């Protein structure tokens, strides 16, 4: 609210799960998200260009007899052992059928939205999830799961995939979808498909230095989307070299500078990381680079990350990111808008609600 106005184009070049562009669309801005990781792109696209509830439920009803017919046609010996360990044969056959039917869709937005819904139920701890009980935030190591299933004689659940998919859709639509549609891309952040000076505000969090687990942490979701996590890992930027990281950040900042309008701001969320036994403040490393590119460094904000809020919560302080560092940059002169926000009662300003009856969990 302080850095953009209604109608502005708000860009996140590393959109991850799409939170920033979604919030932009929910608040009468045009959210644009980009991420080279396929799973991140699918989730971003689903949030800012969602299908309608009617189309989703209509497709599920259409798919029911087709899933029943196709489920028996799959030879599960063709499926990787690492995948099979998570699912009963009954459930896995349905997953394969649903995936194939989604791939055959010509409607890109509906197809993508259904993929995102499936990613949301592919694994997790509750009865809506299709796998054995596991974590939802990341795909667990198949080696660990194999040992756990064997040692504890775990029974793989039989799920009705389309029923779980429908329940997931009802929960997603319960709070409404953004009235403003955004745009999603899956390209290198150093070469965005945007015109010069076309963006009003940039907010993003580049890949943290020395954190290289994204593809592996989503290996099972990537499998569903038809990707190998090893192939995705090769495409994503990753390095243990601080010099290469600086070169990457410089190229990204150049691209942000190119697409950002004059007298506008860019907020870059970085972190403090441990390197060779010492704490490195990435803001101190990146700020001079931003100035070299042409930005003004308006301010640096420090914010501790509670362990419970970390994406990679299983890392200790020596491995992960202990503190977020927010770098506020301006291209030309920019003063944040004087807007007071009641965060306790704040609500989206542009939202569409479709009446549905949400089934109990």
Over which residues does each language-model region extend?
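Conserved alpha-helix/loop element of class I SAM-dependent methyltransferases that forms part
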Residues: 1-6
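Conserved phosphoryl-transfer catalytic core
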Residues: 38-105, 226-236
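Conserved proline-anchored active-site loop of SAM-dependent methyltransferases
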Residues: 8-27, 31-38, 44, 114, ...
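Conserved Class I SAM-dependent methyltransferase catalytic core
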Residues: 101, 236-296
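SAM-dependent nucleic-acid methyltransferase catalytic core
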Residues: 92-204, 209-212
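SAM-dependent methyltransferase catalytic-core segment centered on the flexible catalytic loop
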Residues: 198-201, 207-263
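Class I S-adenosyl-L-methionine
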Residues: 287, 294-351
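A structural motif corresponding to the C-terminal end of an alpha-helix
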Residues: 168-183, 252-264, 293-294, 331
